[in-house]
Each structure stands twice: as structure tokens, then as C-alpha cells.
Amino acid sequence: MDVGELLSYQPNRGTKRPRDDEEEELKTRRKQTGPRERGRYREDEATAAEDADDDKKRLLQIIDRDGEEEEEEEEPLDESSVKKMILTFEKRSYKNQELRIKFPDNPEKFMESELDLNDIIQEMHVVATMPDLYHLLVELSAVQSLLGLLGHDNTDVSIAVVDLLQELTDIDTLHESEEGAEVLIDALVDGQVVALLVQNLERLDESVREEADGVHNTLAIVENMAEFRPEMCTEAAQQGLLQWLLKRLKAKMPFDANKLYCSEVLAILLQDNDENRELLGELDGIDVLLQQLSVFKRHNPSTAEEQEMMENLFDALCSCLMLSSNRERFLKGEGLQLMNLMLREKKISRSSALKVLDHAMIGPEGADNCHKFVDILGLRTIFPLFMKSPRKIKKVGTTEKEHEEHVCSILASLLRNLRGQQRTRLLNKFTENDSEKVDRLMELHFKYLGAMQVADKKIEGEKHDIVRRGEIIDNDMEDEFYLRRLDAGLFILQHICYIMAEICNANVPQIRQRVHQILNMRGSSIKIVRHIIKEYAENIGDGRSPEFRETEQKRILGLLENF
């Protein structure tokens, strides 16, 4: 085996499936050697067997000899061999660059150097097995050279670099050597890797299989880096990635794995990041998300992958609505009308649309959306969902508890924010049909009160055991217990009790009498409701200004005076 064969040898890394055309070729070969074909040569079978044995022996001798030569030639992967590999890479990169400058209009002159360059890039994949040696890639400026090649005139070379970077930044590999990973990620960030990747993305043609793979691997690099260093998401978005993702999502192309991946990376960039949420709003991203989701108002996703993309887009929208400026964009983009239509159509998108409405209306920033929701007859949509949880929600991955949480949160937001005629229309709903909605509210109250009492009993037992062991229950433990109680049902119970307090303060005697009547019938007490609301007020407004928190607490506690 000569040196050229060794250099061009590429081990099967097992990361990609065989392509469709390769599979077809394999099938064709199998067909060509089927029983009928073999039958034609039965007369020569004995002779062929003898020849085959001789050929087999000769082949085994050649393999053994080549194997011995390879063992002698092959160096173990250590610092020295990596340095040698990087040096070869730099030489080939420089030679290719030199020939391209010298013979810009004569590809034959530089094509061989390009193939050599591609070969050494493939060989460098072996470095991904030794993250402890990543520092050599930085110290010997290989990272800088690789980033430079992302702009290579030949997209085959830039795609090869993307493939290599994807493997070097594999999240499992990065965690094998934190020190090596930090050095590599620092160098990539300093070299503005995302900006260069986006420039390369702009010229890739996804109708070409290799270039579509290049897009997928580019997104994988971003995901890997974001998982290892979440703070780089802001810089990545500002370097053109967010704009490219939005453009790719709205491109008129059939749904594929790359569109799914784009939705996933978009959701990652927006997670807990107000700067990126604001940037998305400025780029008209709210409209893009609403346009993409509008497809699912009357049609369910056709595959599990398409459903996953839909959920990613809903998550991205919910994340954006955490920012008040995006609530206004959502309102102007007729997001409320779209979500209301989805609730009525009863498709898979309904559960996620409910979650979006919850995010759009919550807090004082949701006041405009609350008023508009009543104007578009949203009360006719939300109250049937309040009266009865849909049976099919389990099929779309939403629990009955999650559904009831969102509905009660929306009603609480409406009661908090509505004024004038819209508020009157809302309160009238609680008096319709012999106050059936008050009855349903009380039914939910006792349902989640029971769940809370079970959870509280368990937590009290745990606290007793801790004290008995002589340990102290610190603030962190108390916070953990409170979060457990919220998850067990306290969160929705607080909203239910808040709704009770609001409607009992509405100067509608019929509602107040019905609430007290049901509490007495069930042997419950107004004191329990008061206690839950006080606890709710004490914990409200986390992450907001002290002024808002104080004002909101006074307002909520004021409701108890006339309860």
C-alpha cells in the first residue's frame, strides 16, 4: 500500500447512513449475483473454485504483507503526530492558495492540490478522539486556518471543514476534556466562527445532498457550542445566525430535517435571552413564526418530525412573548386571532395555542391583549375549555393538569387586566346558566386542594424526619419544598383562589353567595382560601421591580377584605 493510498484512506466513522443511491447500487449488485446468474456458470464451478482458492491465498499474502507495512508506517496518535499532521495541513492549504492565485482560470493546475487539501482535512478527524490535544490546534494556528477555509471558493472544501468542526465540537467529546474544550471554543469564538459559518450557509445549495449535509452540520456546531457555552448565543444571533434561521424557516421549500433543525436552534437561541428576543422582534420574527404556525390551524402535522418542528416554533413564540415589546408585535400581527382560531378548530395545535395565549396575557403587559381577546369573542372559546378538559389532549403530550393550569391562568389574567365593558362581559359569564361556571371553579378548587393536602402531608413528614436527625431546614430547602408544592398543584390552586376572590369582589351578590354556599356544603372554610391567597401574594413578582411587587401584593390582599 503506497503513501498516496494511505493518505486518501478514510476510516468509516459510522456517523452517516448510506445514501439512497449507494443503497440502490448495493441492491443492484445483489440482484446481479442472484440464483439465475449463478446457474449459468455451473459447468465451470470446479475450475472456478480452484482458481478462487489460489486467488484467495495470494490475496491473503498481500493483505498480510500490507498489514505489516501499515503497522510499521502508522504512528500512534500523540502530540508529535498531531503536530506533523497540522504542519502537512498548513503546507497543503498554502500550496492550494498559492496555485489558485497563480492560475485562477485554470482549475487543472490547482485541482490536485485541492484534493490533497481535502484528504488532510479528512485525516484530521482523528484529532477529535483526543480532546486533550486540542490546544495544539490553537497554538499552531490550525483553528485560524480552518476558519479561513470556510470561505474557500470550492464549497467541497468549506463543507469538509464544517464536517471536521462538527466532530471536534461534539458535546460528548468536549466534556471528555474541559480544558481542551475551553481552549478550542475560545479560539472559535474569537475567530467569529458563527459569522463565517453564516457566510458559508448563504452560498450553499440544499438541493445538492452534500451541501444540505453541510447546512445540517453547521447547525450542529452551533448547537454544540451553545450547549457547552450558553452565553455565546447572544453573539451568535448578532452575527447573522438569527436572521438566516428566519429566512430559512420562511423559504418556500418542502419540510425536511434541516427545517426541523432550524426550529430547534431558534428555540435554543431564544431561551432565557432577552437580547435575542428583542432582536427577533426587530427582524419581524414574530410575523415569521405566526406565518409558519398558521399552516397548522386547520391541518395536523403529517409526521412526528413536523409536529416536533411545530412545537419548537410554539416554544420560540412563547419565549419571545416574555418580552413586553413582542406582546405588542404579537397583537399587531393578529396572533390572538390565529390562536383563537386554533382553539376552535380542535387540531393538535390547540394545546400549544392555549399556552401562547397564557404567555400573551399574563401580567400588566398583557392588558392590551386581554381586551382584544374579548373583542374577538375569545370568551366563547375559552369558557368551553374551562368547563370541560378535552379528551384528546393526552394524545398530543399535554396532561389534564397542564390544560387546566393554562385555562385558569388566562382567566386570572383577564380578571386582573380587563376594565369597563369587557370586564362586565367576563363577569356575566359566571352568572350564566345558574352560575355553572362558579360550580366548575369550585369543583377544580376541591380537586387541587385535595392534591395539595396529600403533598403537604408528605412534605411535613420529611421535615419532621430532618428535624429529628438534628439537621436544620435552611432557606434553600424551604425553596425546594415550595417548588414541589407548586408542582403538586399549588400553582393552579393559587390561580383558582385568586379567581374566586376577584369574582366575589365584583359586586355581583349571586356569585359571592354561590361561592360561600358551596364552601359550606363541602365543609370547607373561607380561611383556607385566604391562607392560599396570602401565600400567593407573598411569593408574587419574582424578577420584577420592588415597586411592582409591593403594589401587586397590596392589590391582591385588598381583595380579601370583601371576600
Swiss-Prot record:
Modified residues (Phosphoserine): S389, S545
UniProt GO BP: adaptive immune response; mRNA processing; positive regulation of apoptotic process; RNA splicing; somatic diversification of immunoglobulins
Motif (Nuclear localization signal): 16-33
Modified residues (N6-acetyllysine): K91
Keywords: Acetylation, Adaptive immunity, Coiled coil, Immunity, mRNA processing, mRNA splicing, Nucleus, Phosphoprotein, Repeat, Spliceosome
Residue positions, PTM N-acetylmethionine: M1
Top-level taxonomic group: Eukaryota
First and last residue of the signal peptide: none
Acidic residues bias: start-end ranges: 66-78
Gene3D superfamilies: Leucine-rich Repeat Variant
Region (Disordered): 1-81
Residues forming coiled coils: 476-540
A GO cellular component entry from the record: Prp19 complex
InterPro entries listed in its UniProt record: ARM-like (IPR011989), ARM-type_fold (IPR016024), CTNNBL1 (IPR039678), CTNNBL1_N (IPR013180)
Motif, Nuclear export signal (NES): chain positions: 130-140
HEAT repeat start and end residues: 79-129, 134-176
ARM repeat coordinates: 178-228, 229-273, 274-323, 325-363, 364-417
Basic and acidic residues bias spans: 34-45
GO molecular function: enzyme binding
Protein's cellular compartments: Nucleus
Assembly information from the UniProt record: Component of the PRP19-CDC5L splicing complex composed of a core complex comprising a homotetramer of PRPF19, CDC5L, PLRG1 and BCAS2, and at least three less stably associated proteins CTNNBL1, CWC15 and HSPA8. Interacts directly with CWC15 and CDC5L in the complex. Interacts with AICDA; the interaction is important for the antibody diversification activity of AICDA. Interacts with PRPF31 (via its NLS). Interacts (via its N-terminal NLS) with KPNA1 and KPNA2.
Domain notes for this protein: The surface residues of the concave side of the superhelical ARM repeat region contribute to, but are not essential for NLS binding.
Biological function: Component of the PRP19-CDC5L complex that forms an integral part of the spliceosome and is required for activating pre-mRNA splicing. Participates in AID/AICDA-mediated somatic hypermutation (SHM) and class-switch recombination (CSR), 2 processes resulting in the production of high-affinity, mutated isotype-switched antibodies.
Name of this chain's protein: Beta-catenin-like protein 1
Species for this entry: Rattus norvegicus (Rat)
Name of the encoding gene: Ctnnbl1
